[in-house]
């Protein structure tokens, strides 16, 4: 059976680093901004495959992802990797999910929505239960 060389492959990244809530200063209203890194360059991922003596990890090179590439994508920040629990989104570079590409990787920032899921995300990040 021949493989379709034009097939689209969807990838889901499950590693987040430096995740935190940007706290408000004294006298400022409480903030709902969550920031972190979705991708760290030149850093081994969690094992994608680990069986017996064989293990595979992924290392993403800085040249693999550009701002221009991301600006053409539909990117969703989800709760627990559940595509129904969307916290923020960037569609073709516009939306509630902000991101940047720097020497460390791909950083992100979004204001958690005023929903049950947004409140849950804020609390879990503040407590350190979700930390990357």
Predicted regions located by residue number:
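Signature of dsDNA virion morphogenesis modules
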Residues: 1-132
């Amino acid at each position: 059976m021949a493989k379709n060389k034009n097939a689209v492959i969807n990838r889901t990244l499950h590693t987040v680093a430096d995740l935190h809530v940007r706290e408000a200063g004294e006298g400022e209203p409480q903030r709902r901004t969550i920031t972190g890194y979705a991708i760290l360059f030149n850093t081994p991922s969690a094992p994608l495959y680990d069986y017996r003596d064989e293990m595979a990890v992924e290392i993403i090179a800085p040249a693999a992802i550009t701002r221009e590439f991301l600006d053409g994508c539909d990117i969703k920040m989800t709760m627990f990797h559940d595509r129904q629990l969307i916290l923020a989104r960037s569609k073709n570079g516009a939306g509630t999910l902000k991101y940047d590409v720097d020497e460390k990787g791909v950083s992100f920032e979004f204001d958690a929505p005023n929903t049950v899921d947004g409140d849950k995300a804020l609390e879990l990040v503040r407590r350190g239960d979700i930390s990357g």
